Amino acid sequence: MTENLTVQPERLGVLASHHDNAAVDASSGVEAAAGLGESVAITHGPYCSQFNDTLNVYLTAHNALGSSLHTAGVDLAKSLRIAAKIYSEADEAWRKAIDGLFT
């Protein structure tokens, strides 16, 4: 690779916002399924207990995954914002240093 790497802090901010939204969506997905197992158990009764048990196992895994995705999205968004700030500050520091050489 001979091309220069460029970082656009504004783009990192946009990506951070996308990950914030993904975190909210993951939480919404978990909330949408909340109570489903109990509802099925009530409406279908003990006759479907094996299905209800399987559904509860699925919902437990669904909740864990949703929680993990939410945490990962929030953490990644935070890291992207920190990186954007660091790149901006470094650019500003180098700009001042270079300007100081010519004044």
UniProtKB/Swiss-Prot annotation:
The keyword Cell division does not apply. One of its GO terms (cellular component) is extracellular region. It is found in: Secreted. Keywords: Acetylation, Secreted, Virulence. Required for ESX-1 function. Required for either stability or expression of EspA. The C-terminal region is required for secretion by the ESX-1 system. This is ESX-1 secretion-associated protein EspC. It comes from Mycobacterium tuberculosis (strain ATCC 25618 / H37Rv). The gene is espC.
